[in-house]
């Protein structure tokens, strides 16, 4: 695995952690809050964003306008049964969700969730590091690399891992600050 491949693989793990962070409520309306919602549509689970236009007319409201009005009830049900705690308002054409301000308890729950997502990202990075170091050790064992070259490569891999872990920690602290901001 080249250094570039290692960086690409690790940056994908960081991006996945960032996508997870984006699905956490912060007290302001955000369309990415609904990214994980799937709707039962003609017998198949379909992502909400494939069935409707999702907008934020103001900082406390999310508006969902289905492409097919027949899916309105299914979308409303999927939102109501999700773990987001939203109550959808259906006016026959558009579903509106009022995003209430977060309680202190809910903010703490979301901070824990963000920490969990960050830890998942770090574990993924460590797994990538382990695989890369195992390849380097195998190359050394096969005689393709000297002991010094192997140690240098392992140090480079560790430095890259540390940099990406710092990146996740930075994103986590930004998200926690955003969640805790009243």
UniProtKB/Swiss-Prot annotation:
Compartment(s) where it occurs, according to its Swiss-Prot or TrEMBL record: Cytoplasm
Main location: cytoplasm
GO cellular component labels: cytoplasm
UniProt superkingdom: Bacteria
Region (Disordered): 136-160
One Pfam family this sequence matches: RRF
CDD domains: RRF (cd00520)
Entry keyword set: Cytoplasm, Protein biosynthesis
Gene3D superfamilies reported for this sequence: 3.30.1360.40, Ribosome-recycling factor
Disulfide bonds: none
Single Gene Ontology BP annotation: translational termination
Any one GO molecular function term: ribosomal large subunit binding
Protein family (similarity comment): Belongs to the RRF family.
PANTHER family assigned to the protein according to its UniProt record, in alphabetical order: MITOCHONDRIAL RIBOSOME RECYCLING FACTOR PSEUDO 1, RIBOSOME RECYCLING FACTOR
HAMAP family given in the database record: RRF
Functional description taken from the UniProt entry: Responsible for the release of ribosomes from messenger RNA at the termination of protein biosynthesis. May increase the efficiency of translation by recycling ribosomes from one round of translation to another.
Name assigned to this protein: Ribosome-recycling factor
Organism: Prochlorococcus marinus (strain NATL1A)
Lineage: Bacteria, Bacillati, Cyanobacteriota, Cyanophyceae, Synechococcales
């Amino acid at each position: 695995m080249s250094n570039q491949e290692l960086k690409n693989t690790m940056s994908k793990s960081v991006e996945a952690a960032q996508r997870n962070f984006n699905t956490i409520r912060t007290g302001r309306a955000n369309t990415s809050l609904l990214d994980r919602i799937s709707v039962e549509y003609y017998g198949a689970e379909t992502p909400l964003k494939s069935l409707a236009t999702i907008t934020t007319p103001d900082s406390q409201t999310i508006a969902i306008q289905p492409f097919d009005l027949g899916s309105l009830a299914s979308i409303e049900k999927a939102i109501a049964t999700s773990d987001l705690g939203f109550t959808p308002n259906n006016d026959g054409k558009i579903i509106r969700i009022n995003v209430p301000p977060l309680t202190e308890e809910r903010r703490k729950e979301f901070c824990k969730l963000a920490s969990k997502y960050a830890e998942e990202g770090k574990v993924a990075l460590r797994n990538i590091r382990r695989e890369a170091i195992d390849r380097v050790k195998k190359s050394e064992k096969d005689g393709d690399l000297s002991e010094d070259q192997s140690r240098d490569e392992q140090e480079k891999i560790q430095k890259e891992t540390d940099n990406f872990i710092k990146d996740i920690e930075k994103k986590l602290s930004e998200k926690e600050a955003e969640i805790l901001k009243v």
